[in-house]
Each structure stands twice: as structure tokens, then as C-alpha cells.
């Protein structure tokens, strides 16, 4: 078993205790720079409403605001980003999860809270006015400037290094968020009185064209931003080597320890019964059942990148199809409201509800 940095063992065990209030969190867990201004809550210099980077009537909002997306967004995003090697390398080397694992203080709550903050901290960029989106993007860019390293994978030194705030990795962070959201909608969103189904090719291309604004917001290279599904597919082909499973990806370049093992061993060692709700939400649901369902609802390329062979991929697809009644149930009102507050936070709830009112009005 790997040892914690310096061989120290934490003596204060209060970090293990997770109250109901700590689990739910207050607005401060997600909020930066004060309460976010919702899309349409301010005006441009010419007096027209400022709807931010997307706005009512957009295909992105159609996809994002569906109850299925609210419930399953993190599971799908986490799946696709776990196949992009620079993201995994950044978590391994620079994420608070890694720091806590090395210090011996990692808990199931840490895994839960990281996922919990994810959706809610993106909501201001997707559902806020332009200034709100820019300020949150700048904040995340400044944080990600520290997420850089010279080695993506010790087993594949030819891959080079990573830098989360630089154009390539910033672009793929945005694209994996948006593309996984589209899969989610097409695979899980019951709508139009029927089963989940694909958008038309024109609507899919429109989704990508609208997503370009988000890529620009985070600093993606203009000459590579895809505006159609065909361009996105070509981009995946170009960066093929940066996607996929690897047995050495979680190895720390400096010590040779295995981050994944250190994480798992530390969470087991530091378990306290008060962490059970966090364990259920993070491990059993988000990284367990929901992730498995997402595998069946994603692309064949992603299933291959996740290490699934033909047999396991077929089982994943079949399992997701057989689970459609459960998927339908989880996007009903009580369940969606629970996940919205838990995973998007109070500000996220307000942004979603405000955007839904605008979206309904745009289609009336």
C-alpha cells in the first residue's frame, strides 16, 4: 500500500464526518463573484436583452434544460472526459483529490463534492448573461493554469505533457462537456410523447455551431473549433492518440505510486458511516449505475476508448435499453428536483428555472 506524503498520518479525524448540511452544501460551494445574473437579466448597450452565449430558442438550451440532462449530465461528462488522457493526468497530478490522497485524508465525500461542484459551476457560463459567463470562465481559467505537467502517461512518453488552460486541452474540456450532453439528450430524454431519439442531422449541426461560442469563451483555438458533427468527428480522428484506456495513466511520474490505488485505499481507510449518502451518490450512482448507463448511451468510439471490447460494449448497450423505464422514472419531477438542488446548487436551480421560462416563451 502506498504511503502518504512524508509518511504522516492525520490525527484530526473530523474531516471524516459528513453532516446532512455539509452534503447538500450552501450557495458558497458553487458561487463565485456574487450571485450570477441569469440570461436575460441584464441588457446590452443597445437595450436588447443579454441572453449570454446561447439563449432561448437555441438547440443547446433545448438539450441542456431537459430533465434528463439535469440528472445525468455529470455521469456522461465524467465518462467522456475519463477517456481523454490529459484530463486524467491533470486530476492525477494537480487536483485536490490527488493532494488529499497523498496526505491520507481522502474520503468518499471528496469524490462526491468534486462531482457536485461540476455542473453548478458550469451553469453560469451556459445559463447566465454574458458578463456572468465571462467571469466564471476567467475564474476557471485561472484555476486551470496550475493544472499542467510534462507527462501525460509514463507508459506513453511520446504523448508529451498537458496544460488545462492552454488552447488544446481547454477546447477538449469544452467539447467533451457539450458532446456528452448531446448523447445524453438523444439517448435518455423522453420527449415529443415518445422514446429518446436522435435529433435531425441539421439540428445536430446547429447544436455544434452554437457550441462554438462556448469553445471560444474558454480559449479554444479558432481554427480548430468544430461547427458541424463531421468537423467534430474529424477532430476526434486528429487527436485519436489522446483518447483511450491505459494501465499506466494513473501512475504518478514523480513517485511511481498508483493514484487510483492510493485513492481507493484512502477512502476505505477513512470511511465513516456518516459518509454513506456521499458514497451512494458518488460511487454507487454517479460513478456506478449512471456511468454504466452512460456507456450504453454513448458512441461506439467512446466505448472503445473506455476499454470495452465488442462483447462488453454490446452488453452495455443492451443494459441501457432495458433500463429505459428506470431512466424515465429518474427524470420525473421529484427525482429531477432532488438532483437539481444536490448537483447544481441553489444558484444553478435559479438559473435553470429562469432559462426554462425563457425557453418556453420562445416556443409559444
Regions found by a protein language model. Give the residues of each.
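Mature, function-bearing regions of proteins
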Residues: 2-364
Amino acid at each position: 500500500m502506498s504511503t502518504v506524503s512524508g509518511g504522516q498520518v492525520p490525527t484530526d479525524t473530523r474531516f471524516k464526518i459528513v453532516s446532512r448540511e455539509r452534503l447538500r452544501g450552501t450557495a458558497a460551494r458553487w458561487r463565485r463573484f456574487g450571485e450570477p445574473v441569469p440570461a436575460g437579466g441584464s441588457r446590452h448597450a443597445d437595450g436588447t436583452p443579454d441572453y449570454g452565449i446561447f439563449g432561448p430558442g437555441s438547440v443547446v438550451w433545448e438539450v441542456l434544460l431537459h430533465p434528463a440532462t439535469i440528472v445525468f449530465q455529470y455521469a456522461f461528462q465524467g465518462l467522456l472526459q475519463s477517456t481523454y488522457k490529459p484530463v486524467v493526468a491533470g486530476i492525477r497530478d494537480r487536483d485536490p483529490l490527488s493532494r488529499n490522497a497523498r496526505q491520507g485524508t481522502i474520503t468518499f465525500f471528496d469524490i462526491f463534492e468534486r462531482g457536485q461542484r461540476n455542473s453548478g459551476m458550469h451553469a453560469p457560463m451556459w445559463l447566465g448573461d454574458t458578463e456572468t459567463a465571462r467571469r466564471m470562465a476567467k475564474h476557471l481559467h485561472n484555476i486551470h493554469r496550475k493544472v499542467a505537467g510534462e507527462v501525460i502517461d509514463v507508459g506513453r512518453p511520446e504523448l508529451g505533457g498537458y496544460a488545462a488552460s492552454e488552447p488544446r486541452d481547454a477546447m477538449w474540456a469544452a467539447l467533451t462537456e457539450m458532446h456528452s450532453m448531446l448523447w445524453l439528450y438523444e439517448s435518455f430524454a423522453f420527449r415529443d410523447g415518445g422514446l429518446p431519439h436522435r435529433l435531425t442531422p441539421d439540428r445536430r449541426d446547429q447544436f455544434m455551431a452554437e457550441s462554438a461560442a462556448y469553445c471560444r469563451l474558454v480559449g479554444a483555438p479558432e481554427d480548430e473549433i468544430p461547427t458541424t458533427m463531421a468537423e467534430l468527428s474529424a477532430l476526434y480522428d486528429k487527436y485519436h492518440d489522446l483518447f483511450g484506456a491505459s494501465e499506466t495513466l494513473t501512475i504518478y511520474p514523480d513517485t511511481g505510486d498508483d493514484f487510483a490505488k492510493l485513492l481507493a485505499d484512502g477512502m476505505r481507510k477513512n470511511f465513516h458511516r456518516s459518509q454513506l449518502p456521499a458514497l451512494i451518490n458518488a460511487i454507487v450512482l454517479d460513478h456506478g449505475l449512471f456511468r454504466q448507463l452512460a456507456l450504453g448511451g454513448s458512441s461506439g468510439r467512446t466505448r472503445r476508448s473506455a476499454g470495452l471490447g465488442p462483447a462488453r460494449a454490446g452488453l452495455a448497450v443492451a443494459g441501457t435499453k432495458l433500463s429505459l423505464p428506470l431512466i424515465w422514472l429518474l427524470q420525473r419531477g421529484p427525482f429531477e428536483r432532488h438532483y437539481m438542488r444536490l448537483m447544481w446548487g441553489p444558484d444553478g436551480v435559479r438559473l435553470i428555472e429562469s432559462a426554462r421560462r425563457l425557453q418556453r416563451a420562445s416556443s409559444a
